[in-house]
Amino acid sequence: MANSNPFVPPSAVDVDLSAVAWGASRTMSDFETGMWRMEEAQPQLRSPIVAVEVLDRAPDWDRLLDAVEWASHVVPRIRMRAVEPAMQLGNPVWSVDPEFDIGYHLRRVRLPAPADFDHALRMCRHLATEPFDKARPPWSALLIEGLDDGRAVFVVKTHHSITDGMGGIQMMTLLHSRRPDPTPNKPDRTPPAPEHLSSVGAFGEEVVSEIRRAPSRIAKLVRGATNVAATAISSPFSTASEVLGYANSLRKIVTPPARSGSPLLHDRGLGRWFGTLEVGVPELKAGAKAAGGSLNDAYVAALLGGFHRYHEAFGQSVESIPMGMPISMRT
C-alpha cells in the first residue's frame, strides 16, 4: 500500500539523478520517430505508457505540484515539445516549450459520491484515450479524489517517444520519497530556458547533426566491414551463418505476420476499457516455476489466456495472435 503522502521531492540519498539521463538526446531516434508518426496514419495503434497508482489518501495538492515542477527541472525532457522538421525531412527535434504550464499537464478531479475504484478507472480510461496535443510536451497526469474509502488514484500518461517503460519507472521514482515529511536541501537544477524553434529551424538542426555524424558513421562502417572481412577469412562458415541470422531477424521485423490474427482486434476502435486483476507475485512465480518458465513467461501467458477467454465469450476461435514484445536495450 502506498504512503499517505508520497509526493515529496527526494534527497540525494533517495535517488541518483544520473539514472534519469534518458532525456538527454536532442533528436528523436528512428524508433521514437516511428512511434511518434505512426499514430497519425493508424490511430488504433496509439500505445501511450499509462501508470495508475492507488494511494491511501489524496496527497497535498500544493506539494504534488511542487514535486512535479521539481521533476521538470531534473529531467528537462518533461518541459520539451517535439518539433517536426519542414516536410518531415528528418527526425523530430526536442525543444523547450516556451509556453510550458505545469497546470495544463497536471490536473485534479473529485468524483461525485458515491464513487469506487471502478469509477476512478473510467476516468483513467478517458485520459488514456485522449490524443496528445503535439504542440505541447506529450505527457499528462491526473489526481482523482473522492473515492468512498478515502483513497485516491494518480494516473500518469506519457508518449512512448519520450521514454520507455524503464524510464517511466525512473520518472515515478523521482516523484516518490521514502519519507512522508518534506525533504530540505533536495538536489535541484535550473530549468532549461524556453526555445522558439520552428519547423525550418528543426530541419536545419537535423542537417547539421547529420553532417557532424557523417565522419564517425563512415569510420564505424569501415571498421565494421574490416572486422567482418577478417572474420570471414578465418571462419567463413561462421560469418555466413551470422549474416543469414541477421537477415532472417530483419525479415521477421519488417514483414507483416502471415496469419491474419484476431478478427475481433483487427477492426477495433479507439475506445479502451480498464480493469484490474490482483495476483500475488509469489503465486505468479510459483506458477511459472511449475510450468518450467520465468516470471515474464507467466505474465505473458496470463495475458494471452485473457485474450483466449475474450474470444471465447464472443464465439470466436483463434489459434495464434501476433504480438510485439518491447525489449529494454539499457546497459
Segments from the language model and where they lie:
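Soluble acyl-CoA-dependent acyltransferase catalytic core bearing the H(X)4D motif
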Residues: 2-33, 41, 48-331
